[in-house]
Amino acid sequence: MTDQSVTDRKRSAILDAARAIFSRKGYSDTAVDDVAEEARVAKGTLYLYFKSKEELYLAALENDLREMSAAARREMERCHGLREKFRAFLRVRVDFARAREDFLRIYLAQYGTIFLKTPLSRDLVHMFKQNMRYVAKVIEEASRNGEIGPVPAGAAAGALFDLSRGLIERRLLGWKEFQVADEIEFSIDVLFSGIQAYGKSSAKRGKTTTKREGHGAEVA
C-alpha cells in the first residue's frame, strides 16, 4: 500500500466520522475531539488534514456533493429527452437529501456563518458552476434538436437548480403544507411550462422584428 493510498484512506475515514458526528450531534455541539475519537485518530493527526471544524464540515459536504453530482450526470446521460433528464436530475438530488437529511440540515442552518467565510467555499462554488454549465449544455442540445424552443440555457439551468434546492429545503424544514404528492413531476411541469412559454414569446418577438425590418425596407 502506497503512502498516498494510506493518506487517502485516513482522510476518507475522518470525513466519514465527521459526517456521522455532525449528523448525530449537530454543528454547534460537535468538537474536533469528537470526530477524532470517532475516526480513531489522534487530534493532532486530524489537524494535519483539516485546520478547523468549519473546514472539516465543508470538506465532508463537498465530498458528498461531488458524489451526488457524478450520480446525477450518470443518470441524465442514460436518459433520452430533456424531460427525462430533468426527472433523473431531480430524483438523484431528492434521494440524496433523504439519505443525508441530518447532515444537510446543518448546511441550511450554518450557511451564512461557514459557507461564505472560508476559502474552501471557492471549490464548492466552482463545482456548482461546473454542474450548471453541464445542465445548460443539455438544454442547449435539446433546443438545437427542436425538442424545445429557443431559451437562455444558463437561466433555464439556474431555474432547475433553484427548483431542486427548493424541493430539498422544504423537505429538510418539514414544510409539508407547501408540498405536493409528486413534487418532482410538479416541478418539471412548472419548469417546462415556463420554457415553452418563453419559446413562444421569443418566436413572436422574432416575427415582430422581421415585420418591422421588412416595413422599414419598403419605406426606404
Q: What feature does the model see in each segment?
A:
Residues M1-K25, D29-V41, E55:
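Basic, helix-initiating cap at the start of DNA-binding domains
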Residues R24-S28, C79, R100, N145-G146:
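Short coil/turn segments at alpha/beta junctions that flank glycine-rich nucleotide-binding fingerprints
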Residues A39-F50:
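Short hydrophobic/aromatic patch on the recognition helix
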Residues L58-D64:
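Alpha-helical DNA-contacting segments of helix-turn-helix folds
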Residues A59, R73-D102, A157-L160, K200, ...:
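Hydrophobic alpha-helical connector segments
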Residues R66-S69, T118-N145, G154-G158, D182:
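Amphipathic alpha-helical packing segments from all-alpha helical-bundle domains
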Residues A97-P119, E169-R170:
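Amphipathic alpha-helical segments used for helix-helix packing
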Residues S143-D189, Y198-K207, K211-A220:
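Hydrophobic/aromatic-rich alpha-helical bundle segments in the mid-to-C-terminal region
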